[in-house]
């Protein structure tokens, strides 16, 4: 199985499966001299890890990261400095229950990658989905923590903006609320609505999708490239690579098709500091594939988890028709834990373009 790496200069390879002994990543191309601690990486992994509320899978993994290479440990025994060599990080799996998946070893879950993997490879790891499991994304979050350090002043934040047909009230958007509730939503007024809705979904053994918005501030104007190397192109590609993501939009996205040219254009003026400012940000911080200096805004849609208790019609590996009902521990809304994953992927895309821009132009 190939295609386990992404990026050009800031290149990330992830490895491991849902029910293997461990998973991890190798970050190649990280510049030397960047300092960080394992605790900083852990803080992002803790946002993604399972078992933190009744609205996510009850699989309990500490997701404790270990940095194995590519750094020098400082005299304080905590601070690490990158050497420019590959940074390898590992996260052990400690709460696998492979016996829960015995019934689906030869069955294809509708909406899951089971059938597609079998068609391509002739074999699949049915235990928790193997490589197609969202468990793999823990490694991406670790890589994203390093990526945030590459671009000076970069801040990447994400929030859940809808679950099913329930949207937040954007007039109540408050970033400070995101870490104060189990849904990573910026609208405190939506917490009870989401909770009541997901309680019903969870009790019925069903699942539901979500939409997540990522905002990156401090993105240097000029990074990116035209035509086939666009910044927004790569952000979309990185986000689409996340398990269960079925759609991505940048800035106004599909809504731009409903606007006139006058409504959609981001007008400009000179700021008091003598630098250009945009009076709106319909473009989501990218024009012609190149960052404008405005916040980069992306949204992605996550489909409902395929593993549900409701019997669904399918077939098995022998070609027999079966009804599939998935047991085990699963997220009623996998979109909740996709928030830190989306942040990580956007950070990796920006870090890669930052290094490419610096290498091509000598400017940042």
From Swiss-Prot:
Keyword Cell membrane set for record: no
Gene Ontology BP, a term: aromatic amino acid family biosynthetic process
EC class (word): lyase
Record note on cofactor: Reduced FMN (FMNH(2)).
Keywords tagged on the record: Amino-acid biosynthesis, Aromatic amino acid biosynthesis, FAD, Flavoprotein, FMN, Lyase, NADP
PROSITE patterns named among the record's database cross-references: CHORISMATE_SYNTHASE_1, CHORISMATE_SYNTHASE_2, CHORISMATE_SYNTHASE_3
Residue numbers binding FMN: 131-133, 243-244, 288, 303-307, 329
GO CC annotations, alphabetized: cytosol
Pathway of action: Metabolic intermediate biosynthesis; chorismate biosynthesis; chorismate from D-erythrose 4-phosphate and phosphoenolpyruvate: step 7/7
UniProt binding sites for NADP(+): 48
GO MF: chorismate synthase activity; FMN binding
Catalytic activity: 5-O-(1-carboxyvinyl)-3-phosphoshikimate = chorismate + phosphate
Entry cofactors: FMNH2
Record-listed E.C. numbers: 4.2.3.5
Subunit structure comment from the entry: Homotetramer.
Family label: Belongs to the chorismate synthase family.
Stated role: This reaction introduces a second double bond into the aromatic ring system.
Identification of the protein by name: Chorismate synthase
Species whose genome carries this gene: Brucella melitensis biotype 2 (strain ATCC 23457)
Gene: aroC
């Amino acid at each position: 199985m190939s295609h386990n790496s992404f990026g050009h200069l800031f290149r990330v390879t992830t490895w491991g499966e849902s029910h293997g002994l461990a998973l991890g990543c190798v970050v190649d191309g990280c510049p030397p001299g960047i300092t960080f601690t394992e605790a900083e990486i852990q803080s992002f992994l803790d946002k993604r890890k399972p078992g933190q509320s009744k609205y996510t899978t009850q699989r309990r993994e500490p997701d404790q990261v270990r940095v194995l290479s590519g750094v020098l440990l400082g005299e304080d025994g905590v601070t690490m400095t990158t050497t420019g060599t590959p940074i390898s990080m590992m996260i052990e799996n400690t709460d696998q229950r492979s016996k829960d998946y015995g019934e689906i070893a030869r069955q294809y879950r509708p909406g899951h990658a089971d059938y597609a993997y079998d068609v391509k490879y002739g074999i699949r790891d049915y235990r928790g989905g193997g490589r197609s499991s969202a468990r793999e994304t823990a490694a991406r979050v670790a890589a994203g923590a390093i990526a945030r350090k590459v671009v000076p002043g970069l801040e990447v934040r994400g929030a859940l903006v809808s679950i099913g047909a329930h949207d937040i009230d954007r007039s109540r958007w408050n970033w400070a609320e995101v870490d104060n509730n189990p849904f990573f939503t910026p609208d405190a007024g939506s917490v009870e609505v989401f909770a009541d809705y997901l309680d019903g979904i969870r009790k019925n053994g069903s699942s539901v999708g979500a939409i997540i918005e990522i905002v990156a501030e401090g993105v240097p104007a000029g990074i990116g490239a035209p035509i086939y190397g666009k910044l927004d192109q790569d952000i979309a590609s990185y986000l689409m690579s996340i398990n269960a993501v079925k759609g991505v939009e940048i800035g106004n996205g599909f809504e731009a098709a409903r606007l006139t040219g006058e409504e959609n254009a981001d007008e400009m003026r000179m700021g008091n500091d003598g630098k250009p400012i945009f009076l709106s940000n319909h473009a989501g911080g990218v024009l012609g594939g190149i960052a404008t200096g405005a916040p980069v805004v992306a949204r992605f849609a996550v489909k409902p988890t395929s593993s549900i208790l409701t019997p669904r019609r399918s077939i098995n590996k022998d070609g027999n028709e079966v009804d599939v009902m998935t047991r085990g521990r699963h997220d009623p809304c996998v979109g909740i834990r996709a928030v830190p994953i989306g942040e990580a992927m956007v950070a990796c895309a920006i870090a890669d373009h930052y290094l490419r821009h610096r290498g091509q132009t000598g400017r940042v």
